[in-house]
Amino acid sequence: MNKRLFFVVVIMAVIVGFLIWRYSDAQIVKRQSDMLIKTLNIAGSETKSFRILKTNTFTNLLANSVTCRVDIANYRSNFSYDDLEAQHHLFVNNVDTSSLKANNMIINKLSDSEAKLSADMSWSVTGKGVDRLSENGKLTLLWKKNTAGKWRITHMEINGIDH
């Protein structure tokens, strides 16, 4: 009986430990950042409906007060929530393919309700009738937990290597 009880206690401790880790703020921010990146990856075979769903997923990750700054070769701009939603919709419907990879993700918890994710990024896009464009740079996401306990992006920065 003691061996069985010990075995059950060990199994329960492992399960509880895994759940605590899985639902920690850092892991939630990492999973949601991965989800954001997936909304920017477009396969040529994706249907228009599937691409529109990516815009829904993308905007659900954003706080209403989100700001975004892009500073890459030959392009600089700032975006609000409405701008990001419109631009993402245009993007997913007007590219043939897009591949965004984020490496060396570092998550710093700034407080109980704020976190910062930094990553190296590599992005390549093929537009309709346009040569493939590529950019390497840094991606920074500031996340904040809202009153409902959901993590949302409050600021996003995409900087080219030379910036």
Describe the residue ranges of each PLM region.
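Hydrophobic membrane-insertion alpha-helices, especially the h-region
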Residues: L5-R22
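Soluble non-cytosolic domains of exported or imported proteins
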Residues: Y23, Q27, S49-I52, N78-D82, ...
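Short acidic-aromatic low-complexity motifs
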Residues: A26, R31-L61
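Sec/Tat-exported extracytoplasmic proteins
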Residues: I37-G44, L62-V66, H88-V95
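Short, solvent-exposed secondary-structure junction/capping segments
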Residues: N56-Y75
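Extracellular/lumenal ectodomain signal focusing on beta-strand-rich modules
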Residues: S65, N104-I106, H155
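Surface-exposed, charged secondary-structure patches
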Residues: D83-G129
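Short beta-strand edge/turn micro-motifs at domain boundaries
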Residues: E114-K116, D131-H163
